[in-house]
Amino acid sequence: MPKFYCDYCDTYLTHDSPSVRKTHCSGRKHKENVKDYYQKWMEEQAQSLIDKTTAAFQQGKIPPAPFSAPPPAGAMIPPPPSLPGPPRPGMMPAPHMGGPPMMPMMGPPPPGMMPVGPAPGMRPPMGGHMPMMPGPPMMRPPARPMMVPTRPGMTRPDR
């Protein structure tokens, strides 16, 4: 009867039967050996990729990163639009920088930017459900009625 060899454990099992293989493969030592094998394999793959990238860079096949070197003396790189910074020419300063306060948006929103939920100060229609809007479904309505504030600090169930 042929014996079963486990490459991960570097050992032969007593005989090649499904029950013996199943018992062996569910064992703690075998699972550790499998984990170690694939851990080493991933490390080898990563090192190989690093070596190939380094060789390609040294041969000039990969250009250096655009911002890897410091900018020359006197050069100023503007911050990305998402980062705060001094206002650039032609831009309106942010309200916290001493400029005029921003007016709230008036009128309908631009196409494709429909507000979600009722308009400020409006309550949903009787029954508590919002009318269906075109587009993908958002969230299902809450299981219990919404609490709508009547006065600051006071709430009552919506009817």
From Swiss-Prot:
Pfam families per UniProt: zf-U1
N6-acetyllysine PTM sites in chain numbering: K52
Please name the GO terms that the record assigns under molecular function: mRNA binding; pre-mRNA 5'-splice site binding; protein homodimerization activity; single-stranded RNA binding; U1 snRNA binding; zinc ion binding
Q: Which GO terms describe its biological process?
A: mRNA 5'-splice site recognition; spliceosomal snRNP assembly
Q: In which tissues is it expressed?
A: Widely expressed. In the testis, expressed in somatic and germinal testicular cells but not in elongated spermatids.
Which keywords accompany this UniProt record?
Answer: Acetylation, Metal-binding, Nucleus, Phosphoprotein, Ribonucleoprotein, RNA-binding, Zinc, Zinc-finger
Q: Where is this region: Disordered?
A: 62-96
- As stated in the Swiss-Prot or TrEMBL entry, residues carrying the post-translational modification Phosphoserine are S17
Q: What are the start-end ranges of the zinc fingers (Matrin-type)?
A: 4-36
Here the segments flagged for biased composition (Pro residues) are 63-92
Q: Where is it located?
A: Nucleus
The record's PROSITE patterns line, in alphabetical order, gives: ZF_MATRIN
Instruction: Indicate where the modification Phosphotyrosine is found in the sequence.
Output: Y8
Would you name any one GO CC term? commitment complex
Task: Show the PANTHER family listed in the entry.
Answer: U1 SMALL NUCLEAR RIBONUCLEOPROTEIN C (PTHR31148:SF1)
**Similarity comment: family membership:** Belongs to the U1 small nuclear ribonucleoprotein C family.
Q: What does this protein do?
A: Component of the spliceosomal U1 snRNP, which is essential for recognition of the pre-mRNA 5' splice-site and the subsequent assembly of the spliceosome. SNRPC/U1-C is directly involved in initial 5' splice-site recognition for both constitutive and regulated alternative splicing. The interaction with the 5' splice-site seems to precede base-pairing between the pre-mRNA and the U1 snRNA. Stimulates commitment or early (E) complex formation by stabilizing the base pairing of the 5' end of the U1 snRNA and the 5' splice-site region.
Q: What do we know about how this protein assembles, alone or with others?
A: Component of the U1 snRNP. The U1 snRNP is composed of the U1 snRNA and the 7 core Sm proteins SNRPB, SNRPD1, SNRPD2, SNRPD3, SNRPE, SNRPF and SNRPG that assemble in a heptameric protein ring on the Sm site of the small nuclear RNA to form the core snRNP, and at least 3 U1 snRNP-specific proteins SNRNP70/U1-70K, SNRPA/U1-A and SNRPC/U1-C. SNRPC/U1-C interacts with U1 snRNA and the 5' splice-site region of the pre-mRNA. Interacts (via N-terminus) with TIA1 (via C-terminus); thereby promoting spliceosomal U1 snRNP recruitment to 5' splice sites.
Give the protein's recorded name: U1 small nuclear ribonucleoprotein C
Q: Which organism is it from?
A: Mus musculus
Chain's gene name = Snrpc
